[in-house]
A protein has these predicted regions:
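A SAM-dependent methyltransferase catalytic signature shared across enzymes that methylate proteins
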Residues: 223-241
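Short, glycine/acidic-enriched loop or turn micro-motifs at the edges of active sites
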Residues: 70-72, 96, 122-124, 186-188, ...
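Conserved beta-strand termini and adjacent loop/short-helix elements that scaffold enzyme active sites
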Residues: 37, 118-120, 162, 211, ...
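Proline-aspartate-enriched helix->loop->beta-strand connector
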Residues: 205-210
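Short internal loop-to-helix segment that lines adenine-nucleotide cofactor pockets
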Residues: 43-66, 128-130, 145-204, 215-220, ...
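S-adenosyl-L-methionine
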Residues: 1-167, 169-177, 235-280
């Protein structure tokens, strides 16, 4: 544990703070802006030119997508721009500090996208939780079942968790029929949420973006899930395809995958995107 974290756990650190921001136009995309969050360790700004090209392989105007763990909108806005005003993105983000920036990004791009923000944590039941964070701007954290002295999260935020599929059916039933893409990054809850959404995923081909753990156990769990639903997967980094994910490979750090069904109506387009990238 770092000295700074120890002092924060002792109550000697600064309180939770909402940092200032700057709204800047995105070069090359007319009418699109990005809200830069001016925290000590800001998240990287997405390359929206690459993002729009990437997501256009399987999304189009009128489609809907779901982003679970939307953070400040860095994984939200790209697909939302492709879905356009006639479609949209349902973005789950329970953390009020990051949701503030997410809502700004949704608002400044309202003329060219449609982002519906859900201020709840996704799960498989309805309950209240406490999320813990290690930094006073609360950028990266979540619910932990161990002592704060183990995980180092000195800053707490109380959030409401919902049964994800039940909530979506009640609040977004028409949009749910048009969902083509789901991204999940919810700390330790990813697999719980995936199982909760399995009926939706199995009802029609849905492109998935998932985080896979670096360990052999984590990778094999991901592979078992993909085999159980008959999906093909490729490792991705932002809007770039890296390589096919089909077996355990020793590595350092978790990674993202893009997974899709051979029955997906855009299968050929997605495969072309993936194979072209891995051959370059």
């Amino acid at each position: 544990m770092r000295a700074r974290e120890f002092l924060q756990l002792m109550g000697l650190g600064p309180g939770i703070r909402f940092y200032p921001f700057e709204i800047r136009p995105v070069s090359g995309l007319h009418g699109v802006s990005w809200v830069h969050w001016l925290v000590p360790k800001p998240p990287p700004s997405p390359n929206f030119i690459l993002e729009v090209d990437f997501f256009s392989a399987f999304l189009k105007a009128g489609d809907w997508a779901i982003d679970i763990g939307a953070h400040v909108g860095d994984t939200t806005l790209g697909p939302a721009l492709v879905c356009g005003k006639t479609g949209g993105m349902i973005a789950f983000e329970p953390n009020p500090t990051t949701m503030h920036v997410l809502s700004l990004n949704a608002s400044v791009n309202r003329s060219c996208s449609n982002v519906a923000i859900v201020p709840f944590a996704a799960g498989d039941d309805d309950r209240y939780l406490t999320f813990e964070y290690g930094d006073h701007w609360c950028s990266n954290g979540g619910h932990h079942d161990v002592s704060k002295w183990v995980h180092g999260g000195a800053y707490t935020i109380h959030v409401k968790q919902v049964d994800t599929l039940k909530f979506l059916k009640e609040a977004y039933s028409p949009e749910l029929q048009k969902v083509r893409y789901i991204k999940i990054d919810a700390e330790a809850m990813d697999w719980v949420i995936l199982e909760n959404l399995r009926p939706l995923i199995e009802s029609k081909p849905t492109v998935l973006r998932l985080e896979i753990g670096e360990t052999q156990e984590g990778q094999e769990r991901g592979l078992r899930y993909l085999r159980s639903i008959g999906y093909t997967a490729y490792e991705v980094n932002d809007a770039r395809v890296i390589d096919k994910f089909e077996r355990y490979v020793p590595r350092r750090g978790s990674f993202d995958i893009l997974a899709f069904s051979p029955e997906d109506p855009c299968y050929d387009s997605i495969m072309n995107l993936c194979t072209r990238a891995t051959e370059d």
